[in-house]
Amino acid sequence: MIFCRLDLYFFPILDIYTPIDRTILGYKELFSPIRRFSMKKAAVIHDLSGFGKCSLTAAIPVLSALGVQCCPVATAVLTGQTGYPCYHCTDLTAMLPDYIDAWGKNNAHFDAIYSGFLTGAKQISQVLDFIRQFREEHTLLLVDPVMGDDGNAYPFFTPGLLNGMKELTLKADVITPNLTEACLLADIPEDALLHCRTNTDLLKLAEDVALRLQKKASHPQDVVITGVKCRDEKHPVIYNIAATANGIYRHESPFFDRSFSGTGDLFASVLCGCCTKGICTEDAILLAGKFLSHSIGDTMKENTPGRDGVNFEKFLIDLIADSNV
């Protein structure tokens, strides 16, 4: 990496954007390589939380770093994610029809649509309408079906939400449920997790569920089950299980025995950005795993409360470099 001085500011320049002669660049020459590629756009349907480094506050910087314009559709505004002892939430369901209508009148087009936290069945219906209106032949649809974790459904979960999520995920090109959400989508009892006596049992359940969900879709779909925790005393790891057109495989990352806000949103955002750029799902999972491992490891050193999220910002530069190799 070298640094170029523009007036009184110093900008780090990755080797991939630096001319062979490594000369000091002017503004025009510095940014001209980036303009060779048309900017991709992703509509991100998610909540906006003031604290917690999750949802849109995770998606916007990650997609921007990956060279994808993030066009937010806020489903709710929260003072902080729901893990805080005190928070206020404003549901934006009533606003969404006018918001989406304005985008339609402005002839908006998207290379990707990424759906995350939705407040209920009515919002899912609105998202399905959004997809019908804006999805084109080339548009990637990624759905993160937020419903629960660690064997338990979230407080806002309802049967109507589950039925809507089933319909929504069937339309997606990529889905990123955790194992609890995957079991809900596949109609496997939540307590199935409790019957897994060994890590082998847990991984087999995750792989079986991934394949079952993949077969439900009427088109090629990549199912990525995130955050499968294997707490082996000698070698604790966390797996992301992927069922793709190339088969099923496991990606292993270091296991940190703490839970942090926003890690699933960061993972899904990296997948969305990478896949929108044409990177295959398997490689995108590797990049997301590396990015999260570094971010969580750094956060652990500072003893940051889990509800505050992870220190991902300082590792965006590495994500940029890795995604352009």
Which sequence ranges carry the predicted segments?
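Short, small-residue alpha-helix embedded
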Residues: 258-281
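Charged C-terminal helix
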Residues: 282-325
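Phosphate-handling active-site elements
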Residues: 69, 248-249, 274-288
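Conserved N-terminal subdomain of the carbohydrate kinase-like
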Residues: 40-155, 309-324
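Short, Lys/Arg-enriched N-terminal segments with co-localized hydrophobic residues
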Residues: 15-38
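Short pre-catalytic strand/loop immediately N-terminal to key active-site residues, enriched for Gly-Thr
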Residues: 50-51, 249-262
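Conserved phosphate/ATP/ADP-binding segment of small-molecule kinases
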Residues: 156-248, 279
